[in-house]
Amino acid sequence: MWIGVISLFPEMFNAITEYGVTGRAIRNGLIDFHLWNPRDFTHDKHRTVDDRPYGGGPGMLMMVQPLRDAIAAARKAAEVNGGKAKVIYLSPQGRKLDQQGVSELAQHDRLVFIAGRYEGIDERLIASDIDEEWSVGDYILSGGELPAMNVIDAVARLVPGVLGHKESAEQDSFSNGLLDCPHYTRPEVLTTPQGDEMSVPKVLLSGNHEHIRLWRQEQSLLRTWTRRPELLNNLALTAEQEKALTLIKKQVK
């Protein structure tokens, strides 16, 4: 996968280029990652990248010319590498990201993410140069860098070969629309600060893979129903899941 990012703070992306799953994917050549700074496309000695909005009001907007030139450079680089890129603007008014959206984005071979700053960008630029707007949630951030890293990390996990275990992405929370089941590691008995002992569920120690599968499915359904019940509204559960959920609802009141 080819990924480009346009940002006034490209250094922030060291968090994903140098560390973790995404860093390893870049080093292994599974993700081809590039950065563009609109400041590099300015024509004044101050490298100005902001401008006042028409109509007045607080705050500034990202200047059109440097940003538009950066987008053009990113698009051209993507085409040189084999095809047209989809340009994504991280924006509060965009489609809210969920796992379905991540899966859709992962179907594209080339993506360019624009990390906005200040009060945003000119609406005409959104109409003419942006393909899609995406939001990571209904809250305020100082810029689009963190949302861009959020999306890139989520998408990267679906790139073939990025995760060490082929089933890891399939078993993550939301991959099947449900929250993930609880997980446990050593020690088998954990002592709390209050002196209580908490043990690993016996089924996980049984070695019976079918019992473990059913337990994990039940726990996933239970956790989703008690913590995020709205997620169940749009899911097409299997007959086995429907039966398990019905039993859970009878047992937990």
Curated annotation (Swiss-Prot):
The keyword Ligase does not apply. The keyword Transferase applies. Keywords: Cytoplasm, Methyltransferase, S-adenosyl-L-methionine, Transferase, tRNA processing. GO terms for molecular function: tRNA (guanine(37)-N1)-methyltransferase activity. Coiled coil: none annotated. Specifically methylates guanosine-37 in various tRNAs. Homodimer. Belongs to the RNA methyltransferase TrmD family. This is tRNA (guanine-N(1)-)-methyltransferase. It comes from Colwellia psychrerythraea (strain 34H / ATCC BAA-681) (Vibrio psychroerythus).
